[in-house]
């Protein structure tokens, strides 16, 4: 085992041109780990706090020099000398050093950067790929991509209310073919939109962001694109939605679809999702209701939880306390996993473990503000969760993760597994 001899943070840019933090950890063996931290656009109120400088004269107040300084001046002296492979102890030390329930003192971005860089340095020292270091010999499941090919909501400047329309290539035999199928549908969608005189500009995550007459029209153009690419909707490729309903939820306790000019109650939202699920091959809905609409979520789960993956993102924020509440209430049946929602690798792995034990699925996810860092590709294989959400097959910040997964599948060889429809192991298919 090797101990930490240096920790250094710097300010870099993310995919939206905003500053974020990158951390390097060096061990006495000479091994170095580097990690960059992502940032979200639609963020849950209960996420760990991302520390920003607030100096309007610099990066419009979004600089992260305070977080950088916290790593270099506060966290580094505390961790230098610790063994890099003691991940749980290192993460615990940073949580205690921060001392707040939401990491607001040092910043979840500062803490996460160090947490991930430590893991990468430890893997490097052992000569192991990160997925194998984190997951051991049983890390072998490649994920089904949940690929965002049409954007609305906060991820785009258009009149579409639902934030993400995604495709999932469940009929593929392996990850390599799954990626090909998604890419072909993505290009097919571009042609379909062109033929209708619609925009093919892209949103934060690489998906197209046209103005459409309704949210349902978005589903229809995607189904047309799937068929024109030569695939069968519902067999080869299924659909997933992320309404990001918290963003629609207003003080009147109702959901405002501003693009369509429609206001819905919780009950009407559930009926809306039921109608879409009955008409289209939709297998997953993320944040179908707001993060504090627990009673609505319970009803949604009772009505759709046996046949659709109901994913809690803002609802659970990768937090074991909120996930535990959801499990006890019978709310949702899946959790979205975002490293920066909770702020350490250890707590992220704890959330995945809790979900699995309760029979919930888990989906490892990017954020809308990404970097070239590919940690989540290794994490999804390490944990065998079988699903990843990391944008369209466009923009290098998204494609970097897919390319890393191609490398991992190649390295695993005949051991690699692709779950396909079995990724949804807790719903009737």
From Swiss-Prot:
UniProt xrefs under PROSITE patterns: ENOLASE
* Active site annotation, chain numbering: 205, 338
What pathway does this protein act in? Carbohydrate degradation; glycolysis; pyruvate from D-glyceraldehyde 3-phosphate: step 4/5
Name the UniProt key words of this record, in alphabetical order. Cytoplasm, Glycolysis, Lyase, Magnesium, Metal-binding, Secreted
- Quick one: where is this thing mainly located? cytoplasm
Q: How is the cofactor bound?
A: Binds a second Mg(2+) ion via substrate during catalysis.
* Classification via SUPFAM superfamilies: Enolase C-terminal domain-like (SSF51604), Enolase N-terminal domain-like (SSF54826)
Query: What GO MF terms are annotated?
Result: magnesium ion binding; phosphopyruvate hydratase activity
Which Pfam families does the UniProt entry name for this protein? Enolase_C (PF00113), Enolase_N (PF03952)
Name of the molecule in the record: Enolase
Q: State which gene encodes it.
A: eno
